[in-house]
């Protein structure tokens, strides 16, 4: 039996919403932020970033994580959020997953004490994309 883990899915497109639903179906508690235009079934949509991140074992950010203007890739959000503000809100030591992470974002994550994994750099995903 799977043990429930609290996860935060922040930003992204329909792929992130679908991922949130799959994680919920697998038995996890999932909170979403910046996915207002595509609510994820079974997940708790949160309008406050800090509330979304509270007690989250891991934070899952989109691929690509950042838009050209430095904002979080969140086309389904009702508001724009800078990637810096998002990274600054994640508690130090939290496992953070993101795709296509530029050096500046990785450096900010390290500076903030985050454990950041670029899932696009994983061979099994890179080959398929």
Give, region by region, the residue ranges found by the protein language model.
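Glycine-rich adenosine-cofactor-binding loop
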Residues: 7-18, 23, 129
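Glycine/serine-rich phosphate-binding loop and adjoining beta1-alpha1 elements at the start
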Residues: 2, 60-128
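Short acidic low-complexity segments
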Residues: 42-55
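Residues in the short beta-alpha loop(s) of Rossmann-like NAD(P)-binding domains
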Residues: 13, 36, 100-102
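Residues that mark the start of a beta-strand
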Residues: 4-6, 29
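NAD(P)-binding Rossmann-fold cofactor-contacting core
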Residues: 26-42
């Amino acid at each position: 039996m799977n043990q429930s883990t609290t996860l935060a899915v922040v930003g992204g497109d329909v792929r992130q919403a679908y991922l949130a639903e799959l994680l919920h179906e697998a038995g996890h508690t999932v909170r979403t932020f910046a996915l207002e235009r595509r609510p994820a079934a079974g997940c708790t949509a949160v309008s406050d970033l800090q509330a979304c991140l509270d007690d989250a074992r891991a934070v899952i950010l989109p691929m690509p994580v950042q838009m050209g203007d430095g904002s979080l890739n969140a086309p389904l959000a009702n508001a724009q959020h800078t990637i810096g503000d998002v990274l600054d809100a994640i508690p130090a030591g939290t496992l953070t997953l993101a795709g296509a992470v530029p050096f500046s974002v990785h450096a900010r994550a390290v500076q903030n004490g985050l454990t950041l994994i670029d899932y696009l750099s994983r061979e099994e995903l890179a080959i398929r994309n």
